[in-house]
């Protein structure tokens, strides 16, 4: 019988892969804290309606890519394909629509039934940020600046470009929608089957189509800029001015669009050329209508999400694994003292390990194999004198220290 393998489109996070993954999450978490964001953790699966409302019944994600199932109680549940919907649902469920703004950071796995390829998995991981309850363009600029600061902290900001667009306000989009219907109706026969169906229900969804024949038509479709109201222009100007003031470079790209009605004003993507077709590493926009879709009041919001796998691939080097200290008892008579020292080191914040078997030589070999910085050797003679031998494994230097001085000494080196 062949050994079991990970399900297609999934992967194990082990060794260097996990080190890179953890570094992205920890870096983003630190930057989020500097911006005053609190971390939330929402369920990995939700009522299917949560995502049908957030993504739209006609979207590819809902119609083709969601992992949905009926539980034993007959409820339709879905593994989350993205993080924003769950955050907005949690905001309403927990009665936080009266305590705004809320700044939310999250990280975790998402699930979509897509064709696996480089940088794209069926179980993938995201970091994300949602700033809920602020309608001003400065909020959008702050969210974007935070995303760029995450990329800077990861050392990859210079390899990405911020593409920025406006989707206007409700009045702007209504006029734009009418123009799009007229345009796509004239070339209806050239549209894909999916887009012909969307033309009847939500023509903005055609703008998100990945079908080659649709992409060619979308390229020549009317653009929102011709339909912006004075209020939408003012918001757009305010956002660009704030980004300039914050020192966040961007390029205007009218091709950055969102197909759902509750999206408006800001849409953006940080893209790179290093990952080929999967070049978007962090993207977001303003979604003032989504909280209302979850049963709450109409609430302004701006957010983004970044793919951890893609961000990990851009890191120049794998972060160094933490190195432990190895406690090495020299003889069974010293084992009790070695265990006490082991626990004292851990209590003092020092990563420490002990080999469960073997003579002194074997234990030292294992200490080198696990990359220990120091070996703390303690035998019956050391126990009797209340000392230990602390050996630096990188250069072989050795010092004798009192037992109660070992932990402060090694903690100081680690700090």
UniProtKB/Swiss-Prot annotation:
Keywords: Aminoacyl-tRNA synthetase, ATP-binding, Cytoplasm, Ligase, Nucleotide-binding, Protein biosynthesis. Its main location: cytoplasm. The keyword Plastid does not apply. InterPro entries: aa-tRNA-synth_II (IPR006195), aa-tRNA-synth_II/BPL/LPL (IPR045864), Anticodon-bd (IPR004154), Anticodon-bd_dom_sf (IPR036621), His-tRNA-ligase (IPR015807), HisRS-like_core (IPR041715), HisRS/HisZ (IPR004516), HisRS_anticodon (IPR033656). Its EC number is 6.1.1.21. SUPFAM superfamilies: Class II aaRS ABD-related, Class II aaRS and biotin synthetases. GO terms for cellular component: cytoplasm. It catalyses: tRNA(His) + L-histidine + ATP = L-histidyl-tRNA(His) + AMP + diphosphate + H(+). GO terms for molecular function: ATP binding; histidine-tRNA ligase activity. GO terms for biological process: histidyl-tRNA aminoacylation. It comes from the Bacteria. Pfam families: HGTP_anticodon, tRNA-synt_His. It is found in: Cytoplasm. Homodimer. Belongs to the class-II aminoacyl-tRNA synthetase family. NCBIfam families: hisS. This is Histidine--tRNA ligase. It comes from Gluconacetobacter diazotrophicus (strain ATCC 49037 / DSM 5601 / CCUG 37298 / CIP 103539 / LMG 7603 / PAl5).
